[in-house]
Regions:
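C-terminal motif of bacterial Sec signal peptides marking the signal peptidase cleavage site
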Residues: 15-19
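Soluble, non-membrane globular domain cores that form compact, hydrophobic packing
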Residues: 21-113, 119-191
Length: 191
C-alpha cells in the first residue's frame, strides 16, 4: 500500500514539474512578444514616460480629434497632407501605413518632431524609411533649421525624429533602452 501511495505521489510530482516547465516556456515566449509594441502611440507613450521632469519640454501630439497637450497622440493616417506638412512623411506613401502617432515641440516643431508609423507590408520598413529621409531632407525650412534627422525601426514600425541634436539624442537613447529591437537606419545632419 505504501509503495502505491509513493508511486502515486511521485507521478503527481513529475506531472506538476512538467506542467511548470511548460508554463515557464510559455511565459518566455509571451515575454518576447511583450517587448513588441501594440501600436504606434504605445511606442511614444512608453518613451515619453521615461523622460524626467527636467528633460520634458512643452509638447503636443496627434492630429485633429486625437490632439493632446504635453503628451503623444494618435495621428490620422488618412490625412496624407497633414502627415507630410507636420511630420515630413511623404504623402505619396500614405497608403503604405495603417497606424501613426506623433510628438512635437509645442513652440517650434523644428526643435523636435517625431512620427511613428506602422508599415502595412512586413519587410517594407527600411524602404519606406529611405523615402521619409528623402522627403524630410528636401524640405524648405522656416524659423530655423533642425540640426539632425534620425530614422529607426522597431519591428514593423518606422520612427522618424528630427530637431535639435540634444532633443533627438535623448529621444533615440530612451527609445533604444525601451525596445531592444530598435535598429537605427539613418542619423544625418540637416543644417
Amino acid at each position: 500500500m505504501k509503495k502505491i501511495i509513493a508511486l502515486a505521489l511521485a507521478a503527481v510530482l513529475l506531472l506538476s514539474f512538467t506542467s511548470c516547465t511548460k508554463q515557464n516556456g510559455t511565459a518566455t515566449s509571451s515575454g518576447a512578444l511583450k517587448g513588441q509594441p501594440k501600436n504606434a502611440l504605445e511606442i511614444l507613450e512608453k518613451v515619453w514616460s521615461k523622460y524626467s521632469a527636467d528633460e520634458k519640454f512643452s509638447a503636443t501630439g496627434g492630429s485633429g480629434k486625437h490632439m493632446k497637450e504635453d503628451m503623444p497622440g494618435k495621428f490620422d493616417v488618412s490625412d496624407a497632407e497633414a502627415l507630410d506638412f507636420e511630420l515630413g512623411f511623404p504623402k505619396a506613401n500614405a497608403s503604405e501605413i495603417d497606424d501613426a502617432a506623433s510628438l512635437m515641440h509645442m513652440l517650434n516643431q523644428n526643435n523636435f518632431s517625431c512620427g511613428v508609423y506602422h508599415v502595412k507590408g512586413s519587410g517594407n520598413a527600411e524602404a519606406l524609411a529611405g523615402k521619409i529621409k528623402e522627403n524630410i531632407l528636401a524640405r524648405q525650412w522656416l524659423c530655423g533649421f533642425p540640426e539632425k534627422l534620425v530614422i529607426l525601426t522597431v519591428g514593423d514600425y518606422v520612427v522618424s525624429v528630427f530637431g535639435a541634436k540634444e532633443l533627438t539624442d535623448t529621444f533615440t537613447a530612451k527609445l533604444s533602452a525601451e525596445y531592444s529591437s530598435t535598429k537605427q537606419l539613418f542619423d544625418v545632419p540637416i543644417a
